[in-house]
């Protein structure tokens, strides 16, 4: 399994999409409420709940040195694949990056056109844009794939918002538990899924086709749809 331990593999599988947590963004959530008169709460559309609850618009810097906002510049109106990594990682990150490079090739010219890849560092203090640029070049990253760094507090907010967190503090403190999963989001349709990056690249691409392209998907996988 590319040198990845069973524990790491199971940890990756454990970071599943937060289907159950979707209920948190119902009328009982302050972020999901508005006023309809007489104190009655109004449930926001799924897309708005996803933006407010998960896709935090924090400032980031790409490996090319460009300053961006996560939601406004990278996610809004797009189909995106997001994972976490760090440049000195020698475990799960190695096969994850390799498999995503192969998946990018299998997707042909779609990456950078209608699908976008984002890899966010878990160690922003060390992973400067220059460090991430060297990492991207070393691994043969193609167009349409950005490596991102930023302030530690903003990275942490994204990590938790995107569902790469554990309720167990000990497990959550283990960086390896947040690697090996790719969050798949179709922002306009409020679709929210994932794939396992340690799976074969062809499986990753099939998962992306399912999440990104299925014409009937909205009825069964839309984020927080009641």
Over which residues does each language-model region extend?
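N-terminal secretory signal peptides and thylakoid transit peptides that target proteins
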Residues: 1-17
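Thiol-based oxidoreductase modules, predominantly thioredoxin-like and allied folds used
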Residues: 114-127, 144-153
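Conserved helix-turn-beta segment immediately C-terminal to the redox Cys motif
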Residues: 97-118
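Short loop/turn microsegments at loop-to-beta-strand junctions
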Residues: 55-56, 80, 180
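Thiol-/selenol-based redox modules, centered on thioredoxin-like
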Residues: 172-226
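Short, internal strand/loop/helix patches
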Residues: 134-179
